[in-house]
């Protein structure tokens, strides 16, 4: 099965983007080549750009506090695992404290590093990080992999609380969902928007079906069209009926 996630507001969209970027840093920084560590640094700079355009810290604190209050209200509920509840509450409180401890703007330690910012500025130019443009960066890329990895870890570590908060919120969101099985007749599915309210849609489709979903949703309607994955025509729709699973997730 292939999962397609569609965020239905800008806040969730940003959290998903940041989750993806943090995962890329993990993947590339764990490897040894200079190309992979360059890719990790590119992802780190993208995190800096995404977080600079929002009050992410305040949003995370507000949502974590909301979830903590809701979960604390379930402590005497016999239908809820006490062990699991204690664990998630501990994670929320730890992430909350970590966010409060972040001084100033998110990524301030990166913005204060003149060398890093000079590299970031050149990277914004297509092909701008060549050795003749950035000899000091070329030197860094030729350092031992463990030395580069240690630098990457030092730059990423101050963002740990941000990542923890994002992971907690997205985990709660995804696990809140109600799953339904549908069939898109001749590749088209429509539903009144009032039937299910959600902040995130998770659509699962068999990887044997060579179609991709094109989803549009608002408070009035949900429309899904399954189109051939390499279609040259935007109006082309899969001709067969397409079974799929759809999960409506809300905070």
Swiss-Prot record:
Stored Pfam families: ZapD (PF07072)
InterPro entries referenced in this protein's UniProt entry, alphabetically: ZapD, ZapD_C, ZapD_sf
Main location: cytoplasm
Swiss-Prot/TrEMBL keywords: Cell cycle, Cell division, Cytoplasm, Septation
Keyword Translocase: no
Tagged with keyword Cell division: yes
Subcellular location: Cytoplasm
Record's signal peptide: none
GO cellular component: cell division site; cytoplasm
GO biological process terms, semicolon-separated: division septum assembly; FtsZ-dependent cytokinesis
Role, per record: Cell division factor that enhances FtsZ-ring assembly. Directly interacts with FtsZ and promotes bundling of FtsZ protofilaments, with a reduction in FtsZ GTPase activity.
Subunit: Interacts with FtsZ.
NCBIfam families xrefs: PRK05287.1-4
Family note: Belongs to the ZapD family.
Name this polypeptide is given: Cell division protein ZapD
Native organism: Nitrosomonas eutropha (strain DSM 101675 / C91 / Nm57)
């Amino acid at each position: 099965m292939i999962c397609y996630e569609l965020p239905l507001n800008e806040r969730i969209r940003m959290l998903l983007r940041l989750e993806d970027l943090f995962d890329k840093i993990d993947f590339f920084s764990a490897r040894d080549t200079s190309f992979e560590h360059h890719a990790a640094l590119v992802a780190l700079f993208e995190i800096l750009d995404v977080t600079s355009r929002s009050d992410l810290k305040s949003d995370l604190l507000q949502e974590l506090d909301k979830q903590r209050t809701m979960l604390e209200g379930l402590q005497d509920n016999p239908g809820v695992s006490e062990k699991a509840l204690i664990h998630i509450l501990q994670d929320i409180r730890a992430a909350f404290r970590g966010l409060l401890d972040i001084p100033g703007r998110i990524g301030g330690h990166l913005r204060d590093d003149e060398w890093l910012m000079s590299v970031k500025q050149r990277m914004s130019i297509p092909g701008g990080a060549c050795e003749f443009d950035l000899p000091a960066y070329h030197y860094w890329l030729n350092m031992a992999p463990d030395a580069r990895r240690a630098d990457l870890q030092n730059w990423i570590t101050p963002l740990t609380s941000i990542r923890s908060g994002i992971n907690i919120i997205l985990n709660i969101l995804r696990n809140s969902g109600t799953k339904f099985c549908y069939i898109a007749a001749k590749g088209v599915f429509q539903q009144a928007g009032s039937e299910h309210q959600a902040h995130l849609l998770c659509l699962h489709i068999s990887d044997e079906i060579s179609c991709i979903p094109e989803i549009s949703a608002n408070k009035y309607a949900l429309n899904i069209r399954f189109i051939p994955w390499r279609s040259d025509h935007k109006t082309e729709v899969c001709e067969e009926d397409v079974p799929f699973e759809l999960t409506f997730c809300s905070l």
